[in-house]
Amino acid sequence: MGSSNAVGKVAVFVDGANLYHSIKSYYKGVLDYGVLLAAAVGDRKLLRATFYIVEKQEADDSGATGGATGARSFVYNLNKFGYKVRSKPLVVHETFSPEGEKTVSHKGDWDIGIIVDMMRLADRADTYVLVSGDGDYVEAVEYLQSEKGLRVEVISATPCTSQALLDVCDAHTDLGDIPDLFRRSGPSRALGDHQSVVS
């Protein structure tokens, strides 16, 4: 993996929603988040690893929200692996046309929050590892490289990674190229727990 060749302090930023959709679309098996973090850090010193999630609030007929148990389990396991978890609720907007037809839209991403955290930590790290394929990070990556002297690496699913992000990052690793990242068998709840906190 290219990222393990660099030395110094490394900070890892995991865009949970982007990662979830990548797993769902392109890979089979249960992702081992401990292996993911170990691969991102390599032989370097971990400064911080942050996992960003969006919690889905699903209500049943009684109005009670579901998925809380899965979300707590998922966050607990991430903490055990060494991640700091930041979460926000999925915001649901309902609008009605003049004819009374309802349209439901969802908003819940961490792009701006992740970029802000990257800026805050820039003077303390040597390398950033971004686990996301989202092109919205390109300008932030360019700034961190040119103005802060940071090495920025990306781990993502290549088929759904922005070409601009691939072009600008210092190294890229496809999720499928990380040894033992996906278990063919194991607790079936793992992906379900991830599903309960991202959309």
Language-model regions, residue ranges each:
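Terminal and domain-boundary accessory regions
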Residues: 1-199
